[in-house]
Swiss-Prot record:
Species the sequence originates in: Homo sapiens
Lineage: Eukaryota, Metazoa, Chordata, Craniata, Vertebrata
Phenotype for D123A: Loss of LINE-1 retrotransposition without affecting RNA-binding
Function: Nucleic acid-binding protein which is essential for retrotransposition of LINE-1 elements in the genome. Functions as a nucleic acid chaperone binding its own transcript and therefore preferentially mobilizing the transcript from which they are encoded.
Protein name: LINE-1 retrotransposable element ORF1 protein
Reported impact of E165G: No effect on cytoplasmic localization, may increase nucleolar localization
Domains as described in the record: The coiled coil domain mediates homotrimerization.
Length: 338
């Protein structure tokens, strides 16, 4: 711009210095000088026009660049704002993650404590189960021991079932009734043995008119051998009577032993039908002949184990072995019990 102003100043000086056109001489040298001056003026004017055009284009270009820069700047600001927002959200997430981590640690610690408590409780339960099993075994052993003792105490006893009751009964009258039974059914035994009775009575002791059947008579002999002789004689005779009416003679056993004998009832009847010659021996053992040998069984589980290797016998006793226990008395088809 300074050069252009200088040029304009120079041109103005030249114009002021040059004479007016009317005063110009018409010499060739003068005309040549005039032509050069006119060319310079034309050239400067063309330069000013072209430079202005370029400058305007340059300004427009720069304006567009500024607009683009502003747009880019706005985009950058927007990105920065979004980035800050994202960073803020990330910081919040980081804080939440830290809190969740702490909660997880707390929960893990509580879970570990619960697992320890559960493990301790399981150990206690297992110990209680072991103690319970041991206690059950001990109770079972005690019950078996008590049952054996009670059966041993009752071993000299004989139970008479179905003997009619009279209005007035006492020990002497009951002894006479027993003597009548022996004379009527076992006369040889009466001649051979001296029947010594320690005690004889009805059971239960109190009479009840509501009772449909006569109370049982319990006879306690001084020796076990006498009871066994009478039971053996009853088995041989098959039918025992008193004044022509049928009665039964059995061993006087504990309630548990009687129940164990009753549970053999269905199996006993099946084996008797198939001619296995079964017997119920003291206190509650089942015996029968299998493959030419006498087999003894103290409970059903022992019999189950035995028949697993004998398919025919297993099929024969399948239903009877799977029957549930019940307290219903099942007679052994008038087979005498010991």
């Amino acid at each position: 711009m300074g050069k252009k102003q200088n040029r304009k100043t120079g041109n103005s000086k030249t114009q002021s210095a040059s004479p007016p056109p009317k005063e110009r001489s018409s010499s060739p040298a003068t005309e040549q000088s005039w032509m050069e001056n006119d060319f310079d003026e034309l050239r400067e004017e063309g330069f000013r026009r072209s430079n202005y055009s370029e400058l305007r284009e340059d300004i427009q270009t720069k304006g567009k660049e500024v607009e683009n820069f502003e747009k880019n700047l706005e985009e950058c600001i927007t990105r920065i704002t979004n980035t800050e927002k994202c960073l803020k959200e990330l910081m919040e997430l980081k804080t939440k993650a830290r809190e969740l981590r702490e909660e997880c640690r707390s929960l893990r610690s509580r879970c570990d404590q619960l697992e320890e408590r559960v493990s301790a409780m399981e150990d206690e339960m297992n110990e209680m189960k072991r103690e319970g099993k041991f206690r059950e075994k001990r109770i079972k052993r005690n019950e078996q021991s008590l049952q054996e003792i009670w059966d041993y105490v009752k071993r000299p006893n004989l139970r008479l079932i179905g003997v009619p009751e009279s209005d007035v009964e006492n020990g002497t009258k009951l002894e006479n009734t027993l003597q009548d039974i022996i004379q009527e059914n076992f006369p040889n035994l009466a001649r051979q043995a001296n029947v010594q009775i320690q005690e004889i009575q009805r059971t239960p002791q109190r009479y009840s008119s509501r009772r449909a059947t006569p109370r049982h008579i319990i006879v306690r002999f001084t020796k076990v051998e006498m009871k066994e002789k009478m039971l053996r004689a009853a088995r041989e005779k098959g039918r025992v009577t008193l004044k022509g009416k049928p009665i039964r003679l059995t061993a006087d056993l504990s309630a548990e032993t009687l129940q164990a004998r009753r549970e053999w009832g269905p199996i006993f009847n099946i084996l008797k039908e198939k001619n296995f010659q079964p017997r119920i021996s003291y206190p509650a053992k089942l015996s029968f002949i299998s493959e030419g040998e006498i087999k003894y069984f103290i409970d059903k589980q022992m019999l189950r184990d035995f028949v697993t290797t004998r398919p025919a016998l297993k099929e024969l006793l399948k239903e009877a072995l799977n029957m549930e226990r019940n307290n219903r008395y099942q007679p052994l088809q008038n087979h005498a019990k010991m």
